[in-house]
Structure formats: structure tokens, C-alpha cells
Amino acid sequence: MKSFLTEQQIRVLQLRAKGLKQSEIAEILGTSRANVSILERRALEKIEKARNTLLLWEQINSKISVEVKKGEDIFQVPEKLFKKADELGVKVPYSTAEIIAFLVEHAPIDDRLAKRDFTLFLDREDRLRVSECILEDFDEIGKHEGGKDTI
């Protein structure tokens, strides 16, 4: 199977998952603890990039998304989502309370306010998701660059 991880990185992660210390892994692999540390750190960085890439892909293919700006009260977000859903003819299978509960658990908020900009979106499987990547609206791109066929 194709992977972003090297065989050594996979082996290090497997051994760490079994509870081994970096020094123990180094002994097993015949390398230094510092090298094991580097392998593990780079593997985890690759995994984080892969997760972010998948989230971005899901966001691009989402049914609906709304931007939430830093300082915005999250109690206003469900109404924004429902309004945009109505405009696009999309059914949101969540209540206001469920959306707020989701935001409290998953979004960068503090005391009802967004700590930074983020996007709330409904993916193709009707799951709510939060992304800190703000994508330009393609309709807006078309307006700024002379038309819809200019991408």
C-alpha cells in the first residue's frame, strides 16, 4: 500500500504504540535514540499533514459551509448555517442546540466567542466539521477575475 511514511517510520510508530521507549526502539533498530526521535517526529508531522489534506478535501466537497470570524458569537452560527442551507436547498440534519454543542466541543471558541476565524461545514455524509482553512467562495473568485470560466 502506498503511504507517506517510510518503512522505518512505520516500524517506530508500531513500537511506540506498543509502549516502547525511544531508547528501547533504538536498540531494536540498531540506531541512536536521537534518530528514533527524528523518525517519530517526522512521521507524526506527515500524519498531521495528511489529516489536514483530507479535511481540506472534505471541505472542498462539502454540501454547505459558513465562515465564522474571530470574535463572532457562536450562538449566531446555526442561523447563518440554516440561512445558507435554505438558499442552496440543502437540508441540515441538526438542531440549533446540536450545532452549538458541536461548536463548543470542536471549534476554537472561548466564552461563546470564536478565538480565530474558522469554517463550519456539512460534509457529503452530513457530518458537521470544523476547519481553520478559509477557502474563497468560487462565485467570488469568478467576480474578481472576470467570469466563471477563468479558473
From Swiss-Prot:
Disulfide bonds: none annotated. Keywords: DNA-binding, Transcription, Transcription regulation. GO terms for biological process: DNA-templated transcription initiation. It comes from the Archaea. One of its GO terms (molecular function) is DNA binding. Pfam families: Sigma70_r4, TFX_C. Belongs to the Tfx family. Putative transcriptional regulator. This is Putative transcriptional regulatory protein TK2151. It comes from Thermococcus kodakarensis (strain ATCC BAA-918 / JCM 12380 / KOD1).
